[in-house]
Amino acid sequence: MNQTELQQKIKMTYYLLYQNKEQEAIQQVQELLFIFQNMIQQQTREQMELSGNFALIMQQELLENFQNADMLGMADCLKEKALLFTEFYFQTRNREKNE
């Protein structure tokens, strides 16, 4: 999944969460948790050093909100942290490819 597709999926998901469309949103959050886990595992050492624990904190917060069925918490995490993480992730990957 490329950056634009992923960011669209995140935006669609937090929109569903803010609209209280629980069933649709929960499925999307599950998929995003899996995607984020894969992205975190694929990070290079340099990416991990640059991002610090941000990616792990973002994923942990999203997972905790998911487990507690906190719709607004999940939406806020996606809107504030997940979009920022994806921007950083793809920016650093593209920079590494160009070097």
What name fits each language-model region?
Residues 1-99:
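C-terminal-biased regions
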